[in-house]
Design a protein with these regions (language model features):
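Bacterial N-terminal signal peptides that target proteins for export
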Residues: 1-13
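Bacterial N-terminal signal peptides
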Residues: 11-21
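Serine-esterase "nucleophile elbow" of acetyl-processing enzymes
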Residues: 27-75, 85-93
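Alpha-helical cap/lid subdomain in secreted, periplasmic
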Residues: 55, 65, 81-214
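N-terminal helical cap/lid subdomain that shapes the substrate entry/recognition surface
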Residues: 76-80
């Protein structure tokens, strides 16, 4: 019952914000958001309708915001993999972009300096096409050690400060490490976990859409 009511409340809140969005930007047309990332965007282990892209699109559509979320997530992708395919993904001509990458870099123990370099190259490409960017941060798992974790987190903080982006500090905020919100692997969110991510990131997505040029 709580989950159902919470979902209704979220849709209500987003509807109010969505009305403001249309009033401020005048966007009556359907906007295209490119969600570019790894398995967290792709919806690993879930039916398509339960993945992040579909749940985000459905939630905002129900709130009256005409939005198409393009799922450009690839399971297992690293920052290097993302850099190699970003030009192809931009062929979708999105109005705005959500960038979420790096989780697999940390799981593989890749040097944070390399992750930072790759993400900066991606951000530079995105800025060149002149669309607003929502940049989602990531935190390394505890087993990678405190020193690595701090260095990895600084990558996102420094990139957010150096680039013109909306910054969402941790994509898995409130979900990581919570068993009931994750699949059996303890890494990928389940349907309820994805909904919580959508609930938390929705205001940032709406702010992103407000910045889309008419």
């Amino acid at each position: 019952m709580c989950r159902k009511n919470c979902h209704k409340f979220l849709i209500f809140c987003v509807f109010i914000l969505g009305s403001s969005l249309i009033a401020v930007t005048g966007h009556a047309r359907e906007l295209k958001l490119l969600a570019f990332g790894d398995s967290l965007i792709a919806g690993y282990g879930l039916p398509k309708k339960d993945g992040f892209s579909d749940q985000l699109e459905a939630t905002l559509n129900h709130a009256g915001i005409r939005l198409k979320v393009i799922n450009a997530g690839v399971s297992g992708d690293t920052s290097a993999g993302g850099l190699s395919r970003i030009d192809w993904a931009l062929g979708a001509n999105p109005d705005a972009i959500l960038l979420e990458l790096g989780a697999n870099d940390s799981l593989r123990g890749i040097d944070p300096a390399i992750t930072k370099m790759n993400l900066q190259k991606i951000l530079t490409k995105l800025q060149k096409i002149g669309v607003p960017i929502l940049f989602a941060g990531m935190i390394a798992p505890p087993n990678m050690g405190k020193e690595y974790g701090l260095e990895f987190e600084r990558v996102y903080l420094e990139l957010a400060e150096a680039n013109e982006v909306i910054f969402y500090r941790f994509f898995l905020e409130g979900v990581a490490g919570v068993p009931e919100l994750n699949q059996e692997d303890g890494i990928h969110p389940n349907k309820e976990g994805v909904l919580k991510i959508v609930k938390k990131i929705a205001p940032f997505v709406i702010e992103l859409l407000k910045r889309v040029k008419p």
